[in-house]
């Protein structure tokens, strides 16, 4: 079983050190997403958003339980670097399910990070797979590798007979929403275009970490076809969330206090409507991970 890792992100040498550093980067991504406050409809330090069965303590326990697995996924990728790409998802599936069980044990059955287990499991394993083959690691190469690993995933897992449909499969059939599977199959196209790019642009303009994450979150909420929202409020709920996020983004660049007030009001709106953009929260964590991956790899291989 994986052992606990520290939050500190240090660069070391060798596959083991690289895997540990990437695992810590993934953990830090989840911590930053959780601590960002206020987040519309989401669990944060101020409240539980539109959720009734979880709070910030639940999320912290979940992060502590799943984070040790991230470096393990990297190691599995290294060990399985010779596994044909079309078989690799099956190769790591049992490990992903074991990580999910660790999450559920820590949260007493509450689903806090199932999407993140899927996304970061793939990202860390893909990084290990590339490293095991002597391929360079970068944001672009890791996303491309995830896309190769997940080729055909939407068709295989969402186009099932009606009797076998899960909630995610029903959303695909009803609205064409592909959720986390589609995002992974695309190589995290939404996260890259509407999370990584806005975050890096905000940082380049001199915004601090928190402001940059808020701007990235609003961009993701404006563009992501979030299945978490649709499962609660239908397409009408999704349209409401996207429209409000776009309205805030179209405002002239507000002061920190003004943006915080806007986000707090947006939070209350989504709490009243029982809408949670959990998919966009997952993508925000992925976006920060990808935005910082290249710098981390450079430090590790220097």
Swiss-Prot record:
Reaction catalysed by this enzyme:
3'-dephospho-CoA + ATP = 2'-(5''-triphospho-alpha-D-ribosyl)-3'-dephospho-CoA + adenine
What is the main EC category here?
A: transferase
The EC designation for this entry is 2.4.2.52
Q: What Pfam families does the record tag this protein with? A: CitG
Q: Say yes or no: keyword Transferase present.
A: yes
What does the similarity note say?
Belongs to the CitG/MdcB family.
MF GO annotations: ATP binding; triphosphoribosyl-dephospho-CoA synthase activity
**What organism does this protein naturally occur in?**
Albidiferax ferrireducens (strain ATCC BAA-621 / DSM 15236 / T118) (Rhodoferax ferrireducens)
Q: Which HAMAP family does the protein's record reference?
A: CitG
The protein, known as: Probable 2-(5''-triphosphoribosyl)-3'-dephosphocoenzyme-A synthase
The superkingdom listed in its UniProt entry is: Bacteria
Q: Name one GO biological process term.
A: prosthetic group biosynthetic process
Q: Does the keyword Signal apply?
A: no
Q: Which UniProt keywords apply?
A: ATP-binding, Nucleotide-binding, Transferase
